[in-house]
Amino acid sequence: MNALVRRCVARTGIPSIWRRKCFSSGNEPAESNHVTPMLRHLMYKIKSTGPITVAEYMKEVLTNPAKGYYVHHDMLGEKGDFITSPEISQIFGELLGVWFVSEWMASGKSTAFQLVELGPGRGTLTADILRVFSQLGSVLKTCDISIHLVEVSQKLSEIQALTLTEETVPLERDAESLVYMKGVTKSGIPISWYRDLKDVPTGYSFYLAHEFFDVLPVHKFQKTPHGWREVFVDIDPQSPDKLRFVLAPCATPAEAFIQRDERREHVEVCPDAGVVIQELSQRIASTGGAALIADYGHDGTKTDTLRGFYEHQLHDVLTAPGTADLTADVDFSYLRRMAQGRVASLGPVEQRTFLKNMGIDVRLKVLLDKAGDPSLQQQLLRGYDMLMNPQKMGERFHFFALLPHQRLHVGSQGGKACQSEAPSTSVPGFDELVWH
C-alpha cells in the first residue's frame, strides 16, 4: 500500500467547501495549540511512507499501544469525552439482560451459554445485565453462565475488573496468553478477558456490541468526475504542524469495498466491521445464540459521519490527535450484507422503539414507586428522557440483531445478503416483549 500511496496520492487538497462541510467542527481542546505526541508520531509516519488512509489514521489515533486515545484516556462518564446509555440509566442494561434471558428461553433453554461483550467500556452494562441474571436466578438455575469480554485497552480492562469481579478472589493475569485476565464476578460467575473475538471459545453464546462498531476504522471515498477516489490524511504544506485531507488521484485497493450501484457522493466503509460480522455470523450459525448490536448509525443512507468528541463537544477530527475520541456512524446495510445470509437479521430499529417494546415504561414506574427520594426520582426521569427523547438518544441510536434462521422459522434464502423476512415468531425489542 505504501508504494501505491507514493505513486498515487497528490498533495492537492480537497475542495475547501467540501472540507468545511464535512470535517471542521470549530471546537478545539485547549491542547490543540500544541503538537501532541500522537501528532508527532503521525507526521513522522507520513513523512516516511506518504499520506495515510483515514482508516489507518483512526486506528493509530485510537489504539496505538504507545500513544493511542483508548490507551491513555478515561473517556467515559461526565469527566470523559462522552457518556453512553449504561452510564445514564440502569434501566438500559436491565432491559438488555431481559432480552438475553428471553432469547435463551425462546431458543430452547440451553444448559449453558456464554455472554460475550465487545468493547465493554467501564463494565457498567455487563454489571446491570448480571444483576438481572441474579434476579432471575430461579429461571436460570439449571444454566451454566460464563462472561467473556473482548477489550484491547489494558486501562479499561482494569476498570472493568473493579466494576465486575469479587475482590476476595485474586485475578489471574497472563499478558502473553490469549486469555490475558481471569476472575470471578461478584455473583460468582467466571469471567475472562481477550484482545480479539477470535480468541473467545466457540459455543452457544450471546454477543453484545454496544457502541463498539462506531469506533472501528473507516475508509472514506469521494465521487469525482474521474470515478471514486479515496480520502487520505496528509501534512498541510501551508501549516507544517497541521494535518489535512487529500484525495488520491487514482484508484486504491480499498475501492473494492464500494457497491457497484452506489448512488451517494461520499461513502464510508468499515472492513473491520465486516470481519467481525462474518465471525459472529459463522459462530451463531454453527453453535447457536444471538448477537445484539446497539449503535448510532443508518441503513445505507448517510454520507460523511466521521467526527471527534472532546469533553462532550464536537471536535475537529484532525486537530490534536490522540486527545479526542473519533467515531463514525454504523452502516447497518453493510453489516447485513456481510452476514452473507448465514443468519437472519432484524433491524435496525430506533432505540426508543426497542426500549418501549422491552417494557421501559413499566420498569420506570416500578423504580419511581420504589424511590422515595424526589432527587432520585428526578434522576430516573432525566435518564429516561435521555434514552427515549427523539432529539437525544431516542432516534439517533439503533438496535440490530443477528439470529439463527431457525429462531425465526425462516430459510436461508439461498444465501442472499438481504434483510430477513418478517419472522413468524416475535423477537423482543423488535416486537413487544411477551413473557411465556
UniProtKB/Swiss-Prot annotation:
Coiled coil: none annotated. It is found in: Mitochondrion. It holds the Pfam family Methyltransf_28. GO terms for molecular function: enzyme binding; protein-arginine omega-N symmetric methyltransferase activity. Keywords: Methyltransferase, Mitochondrion, Transferase, Transit peptide. Residues 413-436 are annotated as: Disordered. It catalyses: L-arginyl-[protein] + 2 S-adenosyl-L-methionine = N(omega),N(omega)'-dimethyl-L-arginyl-[protein] + 2 S-adenosyl-L-homocysteine + 2 H(+). Residues 1-41 form a transit peptide. It comes from the Eukaryota. Its EC number is 2.1.1.320. One of its GO terms (cellular component) is mitochondrion. It is an enzyme of class 2 (transferase). GO terms for biological process: mitochondrial respiratory chain complex I assembly; peptidyl-arginine methylation, to symmetrical-dimethyl arginine. Interacts with NDUFS2. Arginine methyltransferase involved in the assembly or stability of mitochondrial NADH:ubiquinone oxidoreductase complex (complex I). Acts by mediating symmetric dimethylation of 'Arg-118' of NDUFS2 after it assembles into the complex I, stabilizing the early intermediate complex. Belongs to the NDUFAF7 family. This is Protein arginine methyltransferase NDUFAF7, mitochondrial.
